[in-house]
Amino acid sequence: MVTAYDILFGLTPQDAVDGSPVGTTALLQPPVAPWGEAAWGWIGDAGPGIEPRTWPRSPSTGLPMRHAVTLRLPAEYQRRGPGFPGVAYFLGGGQFATEHDASDPEDPFVVDLRAARQHPQALVLSDIIGQSFALVWLTEQELAAGPTAAPPDTRRPGEHVATDEGQNAWDPPLGTRRGEDVTVTRWAYLVPRVDDPNAGLAPGREEDGWVSPWDEDWTGLPEEERPWVDDHLGGTSEAMVDSLEGDFTPHYLELSTPTWGVDYGNRETHLVDLETGAFGIA
């Protein structure tokens, strides 16, 4: 039996549940809490404790991607086994990028870029318009390090300016998180979903029993009574998942773009499958 989980974010447990229909007693306790907070992860500029040269970079600009979320996963979502109990997701760009110049061997940015290596557990993801993102599977040690700053900016003043209208770790965020400072670390808390008829089903796979919450055959709670949030592991998605390509399974992560203060037009959620690596923005 696969359980679906909502993901709430806040400075404290009470902050996370404020405005939601659940209280702090509904929050699932993590198996370990090495960060001094009984949380499952965090959002904000700080990322996981990976080697700095393996911090994901945009294939187009060479700039380090902006950290979106680091999350410890419940056991049934650890699809690479217990040796990799968590993931980190990074936002890139590239849609409008001018290819970066890496020809000057004395340029500190070029030196830094040439020393960069892809993390051995990284998946580089692309959407249909050519934007790049990354999912990194994390060891317990990388998770336990807690919120860790991105590699320092090595650009000389005025050089290697982002040209892609995307996100990166060195420039200020392009938006706000529902009025909040998105650079600040906020903790992630999990709440098991109750009565989600799509828990354990792949999103959009109607032949396997998946039912859209907008379908007349929907048997779950009506929209105004659903306590679920936009960020979640598995279960019902309110995105237009029938338009997604790729082999999605019940073990997927869905993240809402307003959570990070970003705008991808009318596409509001990112879905990453933790089993197959399928990816889409809906």
Segment roles from a protein language model:
Residues 1-282:
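Preference for intrinsically disordered or flexible, low-complexity segments
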